[in-house]
Every structure is written in C-alpha cells, then in structure tokens.
C-alpha cells in the first residue's frame, strides 16, 4: 500500500503544495495522513497512526525530509523504524537520493544514509534558527 504524510507547523499554514505533490505521485487522498503541528518531536497523532499501519512492502511518500520532522536524532530513529523494523520504503520527493526503493546495495545505502544525516541536521538547525 502507498501512503503519504503531510505536516504543516500551524493551522494557518497551507498544506496544498504537499497534497498536490503526493497526488501527482499517485497517492490517493484517503491514504494521506496529515498533522498540523510542529515537527520538533514525533508526538503527532496521525503520524503515529500511519506508522502503526505500515506493513512490509508498503511505501511512505513525503515531500521533504523536514516534513517528517525537525529533530535530527528523532528523524534518524523514525527512518530506522520505518525501513528496518517495519520493512517499508520511503520516498522523499524533493531528494531523489532518499528513495529507499532504489540502490539497496551497500553503496546506495551508504549514500542515502549520508544524505539523510545531512538533511536531518539541516532540518534541526533550521528549527533552532526559527526559534
């Protein structure tokens, strides 16, 4: 099953850009989970429901890594849970290197891990700058 996740930091922000990107990828609206709250942690009800629903072979699509969250350590941990424990794949639309369906060999995994760590760091740094 293919799922999408959308997060905006506040009720005033518009989620349409993310919804359109997921629809263009082929995610049906009923499989899109959305939270309207900060990405500082993963205590988000719809995100939790989505992760609980993921099964081996499922696909989670997000527009960008900062939509997943803005805490470096927690982004890495959630990535591990989804890809290693749940055995689901992740696609980050604005970063093709973060497509776990591709390059599952050692080099591909290494590149994806490096890019993920860098982008997770940037997401947390941006959150700290916003405060």
Predicted features and spans:
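Phosphate/pyrophosphate-binding and catalytic-coupling "lid/hinge/switch" segments at subdomain interfaces
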Residues: 8-9, 83-131
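Conserved RecA-like helicase motor core of SF1/SF2 enzymes
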Residues: 66, 81-84
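Short beta-strand elements in bilobed, periplasmic/extracellular small-molecule ligand-binding domains
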Residues: 22-37
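Extreme N-terminal starter segment of soluble prokaryotic enzymes
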Residues: 1-3
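Alpha-helical scaffold elements adjacent to nucleotide-binding pockets in ATP/GTP-utilizing enzyme cores
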Residues: 21, 74-81, 114
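Acidic, metal-coordinating catalytic cores used for nucleic-acid/nucleotide bond scission
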Residues: 7-14, 35-47, 54, 63-77, ...
